Amino acid sequence: MANKTNCIRNGKKYYRLRVDLGRDSNGKRIRKTFYGQSKKDAENKLEKYKNGLNSGLTNDYDKLTLGNVCKLWLFEKVKNTIKPSTFERYEGIYRLYVKTSPLYPIKLKDLKSLDIQRYYNDLFNSGKSSSVIKNLNKLLKSFFNYCIDEGYIVRNYCIGKSITIPETSSVDENKKDDITVFTLDEQNQFINAIQNHRLKALFLLDLGTGLREGEIIGLKWNDIDFKNCTVSIKRAIKGVTLIEGNKRQYHLIEQTPKTKNSIRTIPFPENLVPILKKHKLQQKEEQIKSGSAYTKNDYIFCTELGLPIDPRNLRRSYERVLKKYNIPYKKFHSLRHTFATRLFENGVPLKTVQMLLGHSNINITANIYTHVMPPEKFKAIDKINSIFDMK
């Protein structure tokens, strides 16, 4: 039997649907209330709830905890709808900041925004950065949207003024502290250091295009247009930990680039053409030498057996060059930052840099590189060939 009424909750109008769902395992009568923006909305939530009973949820709705439902949502609902690398990040947030948190055992019916705010404050006071808390809040916001759709809660505790993310007093903690670039002297020192390196072409192409690590590893020969000096980014190689049950295993996977804007065709310095062609000849020699042990994947940059390069090994190889030639340490990603910085130093427009880097919007580019953007009128992209002195 259902009782349908209009009501006001938290200052907002809802349609309320109360139903009798029988009795629980102790013989106690179960009455459940669903809220919706309309009668149809509330009825849909009731139907979803009933369907959920067949997928592991119990009639004892009041016993559902944030942790148990979040785990079910993440591993059964979300996992197969996102990239493996994205799921790896979500799972890490869940494992580190939900699974062992004081929020985990709280029943959804008892959850308050104050519980979440208190936990965020504790994380911040224990030394966790604002960015960590923002990422956690983003995950919980998506989770609570799911809970609303299922009728477990009526509002999202992570939206609006309910929650305040603790902030540091430092300016833009996520960006400026992480931006390190090669000076012109260091850039030239690095270029000289890799002249006889097996991955010389990779390092120079990255310095001359600003590709992300996974993007440059994922390049294939048919992505290169030698005539027009362009490279098309269509895929990325990622090292991810895949989770099946209680097992965690590291794999290299090929997936689409980071965002839609990351799928792009961009120019590269024309003085890299002979370097890339020489690299291709050396690759063919490795193929002949390896014989049947060689795997033909058409990757521009691969192991001596034709397999994709593990990002971890690429970083190690890069870092060995820095150490051997006493070049101040910088992350591999600094090649990308150096590319962008050189463009700004030479007056290339912000919008053009955004397009070349594949950022999803221009604000990302502006926020990262504000400190190097010149105040004078921007110039055209054809400067790219003169900026980098590739040898």
What are these regions (language model features)?
Residues 237, 273, 338, 357-383:
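Catalytic-site neighborhood detector that most strongly recognizes the C-terminal catalytic loop/helix
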Residues 134-138, 149, 153-219, 226-227, ...:
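Basic, Lys/Arg- and aromatic-enriched nucleic-acid-binding interface segment
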Residues 192, 197, 209, 266, ...:
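Short, basic (Lys/Arg/His-rich) helix/loop patches that form interaction surfaces
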Residues 34, 74-152, 308-313, 328-334:
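N-terminal core-binding DNA-recognition domain of tyrosine site-specific recombinases/integrases
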